[in-house]
A protein has these predicted regions:
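Bacterial N-terminal signal peptides that target proteins for export
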Residues: 1-6
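Hydrophobic helical h-region of N-terminal Sec-dependent signal peptides
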Residues: 9-10
Length: 307
């Protein structure tokens, strides 16, 4: 069972403004509302029975985690939800799409992360989603897509890594960003380092490096989509480890706190962009084949995620 650091919990209490405000719900939800909740597979229990990468990630289930989100936007903290969905799937490296047809075309296994954030800014909602695709063998990530939608409009960006370069596509409602297609240097994507962390934290880039920062952060802070110089550090502190990335040019810092032991479950994340801080603290984590649970009667499963 993981434990958040004292520093992290203190920060969340201060952000919420009251020591009585709960910062984290238990990973094992009660089944009082619906007896079927007792049958939901908790990620921590699943990890005990599947202690290696192959058995954990190739069991036909997705790991779904909910984080209590405090998103800074327009200079104010906004409460919301962040959902991380990790799942393996076959991927066509040339077309860079999921391999769905029963043919003999060669594919690669990827660990996909769908990361969403939802929060309100006054009357209107924000919805962020990033999908990243990283081969399970540790070779460079292949693709990242990101969308930011709110009532003013939407923005979409996509990066494809092919033949030693990165193809970039940007579509936006906003004139200053416009519609662009361009190429950039072949560097790692911050948005796909989460999968590397889950596979082998020791393989994460450290020291001086160059990265494409998280695309949602570039969009929210109106920064150019391109590689930036970064400084990265990996620290192990007993049961918990931390991975920190700093971009001096952007005044951006990302800190990911995760369990040192496999499957290196993410405990929390904290982003600081030009003095504004966003935090997410994990509250629930389950294993589920969610794609088969799309009936109205399956909505009870949302309670297993604290939703």
């Amino acid at each position: 069972m993981w434990r958040p650091s004292v520093l992290l919990l203190s920060s969340v209490v201060l952000a919420c403004g009251s020591a009585e405000t709960p910062t984290q719900a238990p990973d094992n939800p009660t089944s009082e509302a619906d007896p079927r909740l007792s049958e939901v597979v908790q990620a921590a229990d699943f990890a005990e029975d599947h202690p290696d990468y192959a058995s954990y990630w190739h069991a036909g289930l997705a790991e779904i985690s909910r984080f209590a989100l405090t998103q800074s936007r327009y200079g104010q903290p906004r409460e919301g939800d962040a959902i991380f969905v990790f799942v393996t799937e076959p991927f066509l490296p040339e077309a860079q799409v999921k391999h769905e047809r029963p043919d003999q075309e060669a594919d690669v296994a990827v660990l996909k992360l769908n990361a969403t954030r939802t929060f309100l800014t006054g009357i209107y909602p924000y919805n962020l989603m990033t999908s990243s695709f990283a081969p399970t063998d540790g070779s460079p990530s292949l693709k990242v897509t990101a969308t930011v939608t709110e009532w003013c409009g939407m923005a979409f960006a996509q990066l494809n890594r092919r033949e030693g370069q990165v193809e970039a596509e940007l579509r936006s409602y906003f004139q200053s960003e416009g519609d662009r297609d361009f190429r950039m240097d072949d560097v790692p994507f911050e948005d796909a380092l989460w999968q590397e962390l889950r596979r082998d934290p020791s393989a994460l880039p450290t020291g001086e490096t160059r990265l494409v920062p998280a695309m949602h952060a570039l969009r929210l802070h109106h920064n150019e989509l391109r590689p930036y110089d970064a400084q990265a550090e990996l620290e192990e502190d007993g049961e918990l480890s931390r991975y920190t990335i700093r971009y001096a040019e952007l005044s951006r810092r990302l800190v990911i706190e995760f369990e040192t032991a496999f499957p290196h479950a993410i405990v929390s994340f904290e982003e600081t962009d030009r003095g504004e801080t966003t935090r997410g603290v994990r509250t629930h984590s389950i294993m589920d084949a969610y794609w088969g649970h799309n009936n109205n009667d399956d909505a009870y499963l949302r309670s297993a995620l604290g939703l």
